[in-house]
Amino acid sequence: MKKITTVLAIFLLTALGAQDFKYGVTGNFHQGSIVGVHDVSKGKFGAGLGGFIQFPLVQNDVFDSAWLYLMPQIEYNMGGEWARAEEEKFGIQKYTHDYVAMQVYLKYFFNFGNMKRDYFVFAGPRIEYLVRQDKKVDPAYDAAYYKYNLDDEVAKFGYGVSLGVGIKPTSRWEAFMRFDRGFSKVYPNNNLRNTYNRMLAVGVNYYLNENWW
């Protein structure tokens, strides 16, 4: 909880200290999974919802001509995966890991001949804190596969990178595709493999304030 409070404080201080900033809400639909564990595992579909602020790192004007931005973002994100090892015998094993996550993106709009385009790319570090964990697993599966999974403990805190591409068709709406890749272990007791989160998402951003002035 202290880590969540710290992240929220950083987010708010950044917003208050920024000049000419925009803010809005973001949502995504994604497929996520945990790499290196649960044998025949399949990605789990989920959603994410959050908010962002965005302010220019280069000179801007009333026409919103800046092409480089810093964009902190915080969101609630549903993760985990489904395991299907020997499905006819054990059924489907369901692992739910929900996170409060924060990304700090560097966002670049393509520009040619001093003309800002509608297409952009973004990338930045990501941190996440586990706020909900649920496990619906056949005890017989656990007994047979624990020696491979070593998944009795789930890390509360994680970090990684997030990157993507997008388009801004109007002054208020953006659509994007995003990939997140964790660098920290989801299951710290698993010394056989690097068990990390990954996610592929499509989503939209909606700006609540349209103008810079």
Question: What positions do the PLM features span?
Answer:
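Positively charged n-region of N-terminal signal peptides that target proteins for export
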Residues: 1-4, 19
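Sec-dependent N-terminal signal peptides
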Residues: 4-14
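Residues that define the transmembrane beta-barrel architecture of outer-membrane proteins
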Residues: 19-21, 41-47, 96-102, 157-161, ...
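Short loop/turn motifs that connect adjacent beta-strands in outer-membrane beta-barrel proteins
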Residues: 19-21, 58-68, 111-118, 210-213
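Glycine- and aromatic-enriched membrane insertion/assembly motifs of diderm outer-membrane
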Residues: 22-24, 30-33, 40-92, 174
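Residues on the lipid-exposed face of transmembrane beta-strands in outer-membrane beta-barrel proteins
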Residues: 25-29, 49-55, 74-76, 102-108, ...
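Flexible, solvent-exposed loop segments that connect beta-strands
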Residues: 34-41, 78-98, 131-155, 185-195, ...
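Predominantly the C-terminal beta-signal and adjacent terminal strand-loop region
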Residues: 73-75, 79-82, 151-152, 161-162, ...
